[in-house]
Regions:
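Cytosolic covalent-transfer regions centered on His/Cys nucleophiles
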Residues: 1-168
Length: 168
C-alpha cells in the first residue's frame, strides 16, 4: 500500500484547506460539543459553510465524535466529518487555555482543536488533508508551537513553516 503523500502531486498543504479567518484564539466552550459548534459557527462566519447548514454540520461532527473520539492525546483533537454542505475541504482551529474533555486516548484535556469538514464526493482530498494534519501533529515541536498560536497570522506562519519544512 502506498501512502497518500508518496503519490506524485498529491500532498496537500495546510493553506489549501485551513481557514485562518475562522481561527478561534480562545474557545469559550467548556465541553466538546460546544467547541465543535463554536468552530462550525466560525466557518459559517468566514463563508465556508452555508448558515442554513450549520446545525446539521455540527450535529454530524458530534455524531461522528460519539462513534469514536478524535482526541488523539497530547492535548490535540481533530474532529472531522464528510458533509454535503461543503464543496472543498475546510478546517478551523480553536485553542483552549483551560482544556476541553474530548475523551482523548491519554485521558488528558485538549488545548488545540482542528475541525476538518470535507465534501462527501471527494474522499481523496479528505485523506490528503487528514494525512497532513496527523503527520505534523505527531511532532512534539509542532504541537507546542500550535498551542502557542493566538492570532490567525501566527497560525498561518506556523502552518506555512510546517509545509515548507516537513522534517522539523
Amino acid at each position: 500500500m502506498v501512502a497518500v503523500s508518496d503519490k506524485a502531486g498529491c500532498k496537500m498543504r495546510f493553506d489549501e484547506f485551513v481557514c485562518f479567518e475562522a481561527m478561534i484564539p480562545e474557545l469559550q466552550a467548556a465541553d466538546r460539543d460546544d467547541a465543535i459548534t463554536e468552530l462550525v459557527a466560525a466557518l459559517v462566519k468566514a463563508g465556508k459553510i452555508p448558515s442554513e447548514s450549520a446545525k446539521d454540520v455540527a450535529k454530524a461532527v458530534i455524531k461522528r465524535e460519539n462513534e469514536a473520539s478524535t482526541g488523539m492525546g497530547k492535548g490535540v483533537a481533530v474532529p472531522h466529518v464528510k458533509h454535503a454542505a461543503v464543496k472543498n475541504v475546510v478546517a478551523a482551529v480553536g485553542q483552549s487555555s483551560t482544556g476541553i474533555d474530548f475523551a482523548s486516548l491519554d485521558e488528558q484535556p485538549v488545548y488545540s482543536v482542528i475541525l476538518l469538514i470535507s465534501p462527501v464526493n471527494n474522499p481523496d482530498k479528505h485523506l490528503q488533508a487528514m494525512e497532513n494534519v496527523f503527520r505534523h501533529l505527531q511532532k512534539e515541536k509542532f504541537r507546542k508551537f500550535l498551542r502557542q498560536c493566538h492570532t490567525p497570522a501566527e497560525l498561518e506562519d506556523l502552518l506555512k513553516e510546517a509545509d515548507e519544512n516537513p522534517s522539523w
